[in-house]
From Swiss-Prot:
SMART domains: LCCL, SCP. Residues 302-397, 403-505 form the LCCL domain. Its main location: secreted. Residues 269-288 have a biased composition (Polar residues). The gene is CRISPLD1. SUPFAM superfamilies: LCCL domain, PR-1-like. Residues 1-23 form the signal peptide. It comes from Gallus gallus. Residues 246-298 are annotated as: Disordered. CDD domains: CAP_CRISPLD1. Residues 66-206 form the SCP domain. Keywords: Disulfide bond, Repeat, Secreted, Signal. This is Cysteine-rich secretory protein LCCL domain-containing 1. It is found in: Secreted. It comes from the Eukaryota.
Amino acid sequence: MKYVVQEWLRITTLLFIAQAVSAMVLPNATLLEELLEKYMDEDGEWWIANVSRKRAITDSDMQSILDLHNKLRGQVYPPASNMEYMTWDTELERSAESWAETCLWEHGPASLLPSIGQNLGAHWGRYRPPTFHVQAWYDEVRDFTYPHPHECNPYCPYKCSGPVCTHYTQVVWATSSRIGCAINLCHNMNIWGQIWPKAVYLVCNYSPKGNWWGHAPYKPGRPCSACPPSFGGGCRENLCYREGSERPYSPHEPEEETNEIERQRSKAQDATAQSRPRTHSPSGSTGSEDSEKNEVISTQQMSQIVSCEVRLRDQCKGTTCNRYECPAGCLDSKAKVIGSVHYEMQSSICKAAIHYGILDNEGGWVDVTRQGRKNYFIKSYRNGIQSIGKYQSANSFTVSKVTVQAITCETTVEQLCPFQKPASHCPRVYCPHNCMQANPHYARVIGTRIYSDISSICRAAVHAGVVRNEGGYVDVMPVDKRKVYIASFLNGIFSESLQNPPGKQGIQSICCRLNQVDYKTGK
């Protein structure tokens, strides 16, 4: 099951994962603020954890997660007679850390799932404490109806009026008395086909596992009236409590109280990472040794980097004038914006994007579409920018948001964004690794530099030198049909030739390599 809750004002997508259920948080914001500051050193560089460190969560975050779980477990309704006090388990923490490091939006590992419960949460954008996810899991209680004893004959019905309630039931499962969580910063996570540049990933593992089919999460009754004998009659805040169970883990030195983000890397590796896509190396043979013999690396960009003052009239030349990268701080620029919705060609590209609401003052990517002549342009004040009115005919343009979409090795432009006159804006796509090994019958490459729209986008990108076999970001631009597509062998891939394809157009795959994309805003 997959659960999405949209908060209209913040345009936020929520997703949380209990066993066999997924969940996350996507606020429309530009910075990770306080949380990311924890993971940066004094020079502003990402902090690199020491290999010997085992902790993947700070003591303060650990304690807040644990305290909130116990608080919520003690206040269930109807009251629980056998709800056990929850303690921290370092082994569960380590297993959560191991899974968090995979940055996969699914439950795992498969070998542990039969014996543990698991809730997952993630967000990117503005700072959210880990307890935000815990509270959201619990808030599913509004859709859950507790099964009364007379309904359990012998199995209890599962009554959930919302999309999912299993996150809540795992949090309050009476016998799930141990918890261990980890937090990891994941770069370029694939979330339901969307790429999140910097996702903060929370994994919480529970033991013994909950959510057993046909069972209620706890026994109703007077608090602590049905505690297991091993608790010796102890009760704390409506929870069955065993003396000496409050801190079963060893405290760590303050300097080690920080989340592990990446493994130790040498300066040489860091320098290499700045010039290559940050993706995991595929296992096994990739064919890269052979491709080096005919390696062609494209450094041409479809998108253009512009300043706050650049006007579309100055910059828009040729077929590539559709995507621009704007810097931060354009609200302070004196550049003019003429019009509303439709902007005159002498308008600042970046300030028009802010005026329309595509970007904020942090900058980012914007798509531009030329719209031909308009008889007049209306002034308005939006998002901190006053635009100017003009009552003379002039050429115009509109702005739109640049989206990012993950695709497969077989995805084609014909499927993704077919050509439409005068032009089509395709999303920025993220190609997976190992597309060189994809079946060439299902992932064809037709052409050289300009490819037929029935070609595999990702294999064409490898062929063109836009990305390597490790995958990465690619921009594609549908263009009008071509009569001839030329075959060639480049970067380990043979492309096909084709002449006079009926009704087909070409795709111009021009570079946007991963290290050339600045995802400051995720826009």
